[in-house]
């Protein structure tokens, strides 16, 4: 990576703190990333100097806040290379984005006996909403299997399509295995069957270039907090020709043009899907986070994280009795593992006492855990500010804990 990692780390104040008297080693980036100072400063500054409700306000502060909010939408559009800001819907996060799409798409286009295709490695947020729709409308959920390396079986995927298949909804990068799924190829396959695709990009957007036009994605979702932005803000991208055909998800202010007791006419895109007061300050934080990523270059970030992941795999494999889950040729900056008979919770707890933050459990992917034949793992996930020396600290910590069992 052709940037100064130490300088990057200085942009993230939390990385200088200690935990139990030890320097913080933060390897829980798959759950949420830390925030650079310029993001936090932007949030504080807007609260102090610009705070006012957006849209329809005639006063100066409201107009200024609206300009910032809509400029943030343009920043997102440019970052993912959408055609228009009409295709960028702000939500509270990936989970709400998926629920919005499932509800609106399901109501408009799916009937009893229709089918959605998902994969075995989905996060619960891309399983449970479809199950709720299945309970309500009687749709069927078909599941793409994977091999023992953690790679989706594309031949089996092809076989799942039928005349009742209405949509494919798959994760781009597994939050457990790190597998980078070939979503461009999978989208092309779906389109050959006349079926649209929803891509869960929560674990890919911080780590690699995501271009919705290059992928030809019909819908794509992600969260701000996974890419150095604030919590409570997410994005639903949808091709305009698809979004224009979907009914609203929620009713309320802003998503309407005219209301009477007899009839309501709905607003134009994207506001039709943004009922109520948006997190207009959070969207500023997201835009600043995307600017920060652009400032360092997503390709350079990806190269650095690939180097880190390769090094981590090499070092972790030196530990006796370690089991690393996922051996896909294309993988992201996530490594899940177990060591001997040590329970994942015990290992994670004892690493925490050494100042090392990892995630333990099923990672909201219980069907995948069932496929792997385990209850949970320890997960280390990396970001642009992590270093090889931190990986050495992790390995030393695991070795120290292992001697206790």
PLM features: what roles do these ranges have?
Residues 1-405:
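Pyridoxal 5′-phosphate
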């Amino acid at each position: 990576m052709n940037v100064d990692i130490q300088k990057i780390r200085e942009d993230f104040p939390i990385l200088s703190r200690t935990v139990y008297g030890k320097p913080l080693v933060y390897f829980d980036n798959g759950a949420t990333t830390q925030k650079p100072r310029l993001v936090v400063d932007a949030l504080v500054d807007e609260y102090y100097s610009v705070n006012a409700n957006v849209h329809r306000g005639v006063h100066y502060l409201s107009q200024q806040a609206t300009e910032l909010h809509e400029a943030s939408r343009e920043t997102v559009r440019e970052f993912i290379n959408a055609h228009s800001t009409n295709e960028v819907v702000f939500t509270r996060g990936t989970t709400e984005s998926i629920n919005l799409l499932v509800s609106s798409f399901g109501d408009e286009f799916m009937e009893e006996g229709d089918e959605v295709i998902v994969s075995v490695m989905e996060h619960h947020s891309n399983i449970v909403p479809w199950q709720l729709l299945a309970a309500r409308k009687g749709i069927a959920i078909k599941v793409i299997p994977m091999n023992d390396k953690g790679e989706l079986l594309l031949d089996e995927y092809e076989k799942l399509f039928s005349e009742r298949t209405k949509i494919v909804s798959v994760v781009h990068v597994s939050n457990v295995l790190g597998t980078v799924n070939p979503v461009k190829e999978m989208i092309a396959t779906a389109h050959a069957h006349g079926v649209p695709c929803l891509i869960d990009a929560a674990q890919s957007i911080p780590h690699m270039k995501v271009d919705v036009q290059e992928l030809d994605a019909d819908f794509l979702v992600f969260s701000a907090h996974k890419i150095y932005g604030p919590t409570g803000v997410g994005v639903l991208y949808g091709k305009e020709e698809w979004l224009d055909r979907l009914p609203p998800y929620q009713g309320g202010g802003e998503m309407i043009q005219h209301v009477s007791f007899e009839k309501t006419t709905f607003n134009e895109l994207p506001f039709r899907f943004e009922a109520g007061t948006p997190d207009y300050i959070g969207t500023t934080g997201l835009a600043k986070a995307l600017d920060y990523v652009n400032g360092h270059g997503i390709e350079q970030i990806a190269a650095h994280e690939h180097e880190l992941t390769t090094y981590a795999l090499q070092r972790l494999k030196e530990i006796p009795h370690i089991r690393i889950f996922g051996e896909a040729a294309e993988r992201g900056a996530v490594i899940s593992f177990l060591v001997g008979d040590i329970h994942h919770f015990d290992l994670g707890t004892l690493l925490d006492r050494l100042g090392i933050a990892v995630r333990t459990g099923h990672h909201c992917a219980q069907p995948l855990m069932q496929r792997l034949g385990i209850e949970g793992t320890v997960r280390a996930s990396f970001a642009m500010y992590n270093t090889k020396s931190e990986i050495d600290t992790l390995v030393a910590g695991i070795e120290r804990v292992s001697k206790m069992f």
